[in-house]
Each structure stands twice: as structure tokens, then as C-alpha cells.
Amino acid sequence: MLHEKYSLKNPYFDPPESTFEPTKKEKNVDAVNIIPGEDLTYFDCRILPNYNLEEILNDIQELAKEYEKKTGATIKIEVLQKSVAPKPTDANAKIVTMLKDALKTVRRIDAKVGGIGGGTCAAFFREIDIPAVVWSTIDETAHQPNEYAKIKNLVNDAKIYAFLMQQA
């Protein structure tokens, strides 16, 4: 129901739609032949800024109530972390064009403007109306067991930051 109701796609984000995904389940019984009396599951929801977070949380509560009526189960929902994204940096902001120019000049990279469905250090600046960008060279291993960072990438990123400082 949530994916259908909140189906807007925004090409600036990766993924381009809101997500409502179960990401962690805690152990509840010690043996395979025991039916658990309780279950504890965590969801990671990344909501596009177009939506009202409180409305989505209300919809989740309503879904839980419907399931309780249907099954007799008791469902308790607890929000462990909630963050409403601040207004995004304008794609034409000076810092955006400066970073794109630096990437083109120093690394021959044609950058595209985008966002992620999660928190970054830029959010703290955007909350106080400072346009901010986030960028780095990565191998797409974040939050995985084999997560790593290459020294070569860090050095190349430092060259971009140095170029930006020279232009400021």
C-alpha cells in the first residue's frame, strides 16, 4: 500500500522513489520447532522530500491497526530515528556549478546533480540555509561487509577540494 500511495519518482534521487524496506530482524526463539510469540523487525524508510513524513507515519499506524483487527495480533510501532530532510540545494547554486566545473577541469568528469535518500553532512548546512553539496569517489561498497576506501580516490578527491579553494 505504501509503495502504491507514495509512488512519485524524482530523478534527482537514487533510488528515485521512496523506500519502505525491512532491513533487520532480531532473533526471537532458540529452536526451529518453536513458534515465536513475539517478533521484532526494523524498517528503513527513505522518503522523498515531496511527502509529509507525519502523513506516512499515520498511514503506517493505520495499516498496523487493520492487520491487528484482521489477525488478532498486537503491533507496536516505535520510531527509532526520524529526520525530515531540509530544502535541497538549488541545482544552479554557486557551489554546485563550482563543483561541477572543478570535476570537469581536474578529473574530466561530467557531474550530474542528484541526491540520496538518507542523511549526509550537507543536511546540517542546508538546515541553516547554507547551500551545500556532497561528493566523493567511491566503489559503491558503503554499509557492506567489504566496505573500503581507496587511497587513490581520497587523493583525487583532495585535488578537487584544493581546486575549489583556489577558485573561492
Residue ranges and their predicted role:
Residues 1-168:
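Metal-dependent amide/peptide-bond hydrolase catalytic core
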